[in-house]
């Protein structure tokens, strides 16, 4: 299965009538493996900030999580495993696998829990596969 198929079929899938507004799978170095057409262009320093927070949990909290220049307030995640952010009625979930970052961006009517489930389920699967 191609990385694009993982994004299209497993991240941008419908859940309880809703779906993510954007999603991507990127390497730890910031290289884009696959993304939805709506995913924002990430800046290198944004990926560096995300990776730093996985290595030193809490480092993004004071400044916020930035994706494509959009700032998300960091909310409780799982230190070293999942970073969650909120912006108005929407937000983001970032799950770190062995080789990649899975990023899901959502907006109402999708809920934070639905976004977490979609992103983390695929992330857990990739971890089980050694990816």
UniProtKB/Swiss-Prot annotation:
Binds to actin and affects the structure of the cytoskeleton. At high concentrations, profilin prevents the polymerization of actin, whereas it enhances it at low concentrations. By binding to PIP2, it inhibits the formation of IP3 and DG. Pfam families: Profilin. Belongs to the profilin family. Keywords: Actin-binding, Allergen, Cytoplasm, Cytoskeleton. Occurs in many kinds of cells as a complex with monomeric actin in a 1:1 ratio. It comes from Malus domestica. This is Profilin-2. GO terms for molecular function: actin monomer binding.
């Amino acid at each position: 299965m191609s990385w694009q198929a993982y994004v299209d079929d497993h991240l941008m899938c419908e859940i309880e009538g809703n779906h993510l507004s954007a999603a991507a799978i990127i390497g730890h170095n910031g290289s884009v493996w696959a993304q939805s057409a709506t995913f924002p262009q990430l800046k290198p320093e944004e990926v560096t900030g995300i990776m730093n927070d996985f290595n030193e949990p809490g480092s993004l909290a004071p400044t916020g999580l930035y994706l494509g220049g959009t700032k998300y307030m960091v909310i409780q995640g799982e230190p070293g495993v999942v970073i969650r952010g909120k912006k108005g009625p929407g937000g983001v979930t970032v799950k770190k696998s062995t080789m990649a970052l899975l990023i899901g961006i959502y907006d109402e009517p999708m809920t934070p829990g639905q976004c977490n489930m979609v992103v983390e389920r695929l992330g857990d699967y990739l971890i089980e596969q050694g990816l």
